[in-house]
Amino acid sequence: QAYVQLADETALKITGNYLDWLSFLTTASRLYKYPYHDQLMIYAQRPDASACAAYELWNGTMHRYIRRGAKGIALLNPTANGMRIRYVFDVSDTGTRADSRNVDVWQLTEAAEPAVRKMLAEEFSADASMRLVQQIEQLAERQALAYWNEHRRDILDSVDDSALSEYDDFAAGASFRKAAAASISAVIQT
């Protein structure tokens, strides 16, 4: 129950303040393999986390051990019988052995930028003449628009008590798309 409350409080906090939202997005950018609700729980407990996994993955696949005294990060999994808690650990909670695998956190290098720009142009029809940052922003705007078009009714039905509730449908859509595009772009560029 305490973890459900933590999730609710954290969601209110990050959606109520721009700087808190950016801080959350920074954490989310490192944890892109996790869904939003897991990213939210990780942010609430360990905003500095950079690479999280279950005990079994660290110990088995990665041949790393969890340091004594390390506190797991609780994640909530809804089941038919209510909420189930599972734990993950950040790489900073682990230690190495002789046969440990390295944890390489992916980063875009300057040398790889031309290849990434070319791939974005070929695979996603991004404007090849744009800089990488501009391509990312262009694609983020497209994704935000596509999401809005697909989920417009659901979004408009859920905006009570939010800033969007004061807008007509057109203005709410424009505001949502702008915020979503900025968030997508921020996560990718962080």
Residue ranges with predicted function:
Residues 1-190:
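N-terminal accessory/interface modules of nucleic-acid-binding and processing proteins
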